Amino acid sequence: MGNTLFFISLSLIWVMLLYHMFLMQGGFRHYMTFERNIPKWRENMKELPKVSVLIPAHNEEVVIRQTLKAMVNLYYPKDRLEIIVVNDNSSDRTGDIVNEFSEKYDFIKMVITKPPNAGKGKSSALNSGFAESNGDVICVYDADNTPEKMAVYYLVLGLMNDEKAGAVVGKFRVINAAKTLLTRFINIETICFQWMAQGGRWKWFKIATIPGTNFAIRRSIIEKLGGWDDKALAEDTELTIRVYNLGYHIRFFPAAITWEQEPETWKVWWRQRTRWARGNQYVVLKFLAQFFKLKRKRIIFDLFYFFFTYFLFFFGVIMSNAIFVVNLFYDLHLSVGFLAMILWILAFFLFMTEVMITLSIEKTEMNKQNFFIVFLMYFTYSQAWIVLVIYSLFVEIKHRLFKQEVKWYKTERYNQHKSG
């Protein structure tokens, strides 16, 4: 029995490791080629479309001023741009700060959510903002984001030059990466996610996931889909599946860059990532239940990726860890004990290799300090994710059983400028 469980757990772990090695190669290839189309795309852009940028905001007085300054500095004709801040049930000075900007710049305006939609979450806030927008292209940014000057232009450039693209997603970087050890972990995690999961899947399968920020989507698509799902905690992943089901693809175009804050304490990280994990579990369960109604095979492939990530892979890791701990105190008579040790060591070195090669894509991230951080990350941050996924699954099941209402979770913000 012990041997069987061991082989199952190890198989699940190695399938995911090898798949991510494959994705890493794709991400690296995409990095080498994605800028080649820019000159040709620029020539093709005879006229820029009207763009509406939606910024959902709930008690964001700490960061909203910096975000709006970045919006003012965007390289995009202001007569073709509208910035809509959705003030969702804020009790701080968010509204006052937005009003300061709207009085000075006529392309900035504020939408205030009203009952019964006020305070219902990001999806509901986006729907309120969308209803007041008139752009042919809709961009979304979180309230803590500082997009680079060319970000929106590049998102539009990628979208308008690809008729099959329903949406284009850019790259986000961690603005407070050097603040704490946790933010250094998150910085490495986000780089790997974007170049492996986003860049790799785009290169090999023409698949990418809409993130919560720094993306552009066609207005016509949002209208066809009836807006964002206000029951989804991971509204971005949920929207992704529905866009693919319409027959479009989602392009990963890392020329469009934004900088965002990440949690600086474990408590804030736990709450935020629990919401993310629950959101993705909701999406997997929602669309697996509609499995035979899905029209596009590409979606099915991506659903299995999320199912494997949030269910089977973590099950394999948990089982592997449990076997290791139990075997310390009780001999399970594993016939492959030595082989197990070799495979565990190889898995660790493969993890280190994948991450360091991916970090080499970002010029400033391939250094000795990050090597030791990745080493430490394997034994701490990665293990914390395992506990979090178990907890989030428990919370999501309880949420479904008791039919609890989706609430906006406010991630803590910090006063700062770009670091590290």
UniProtKB/Swiss-Prot annotation:
Keyword annotations from UniProtKB, A to Z: Cell membrane, Glycosyltransferase, Membrane, Transferase, Transmembrane, Transmembrane helix
Top-level taxonomic group: Bacteria
Q: What class of enzyme is it?
A: transferase
Q: Which coarse location class describes where this protein primarily resides?
A: membrane
Question: Does the keyword Transferase belong to this entry?
Answer: yes
**Molecular function GO labels:** glycosyltransferase activity
Residues of the signal sequence? none
E.C. no: 2.4.-.-
Q: List the SUPFAM superfamilies.
A: Nucleotide-diphospho-sugar transferases (SSF53448)
Membrane-spanning ranges: 4-24, 299-319, 332-352, 371-391
- The answer to whether UniProt assigns keyword Transmembrane to this entry is yes
A single GO CC term for this protein reads: membrane
- What topology in the membrane does the UniProt record assign? Multi-pass membrane protein
In terms of Pfam families, this protein maps to: Glycos_transf_2 (PF00535)
Q: Where in the cell is it found?
A: Cell membrane
What's the family?
Belongs to the glycosyltransferase 2 family.
Quote the protein name from its UniProt record.
Probable glycosyltransferase YdaM
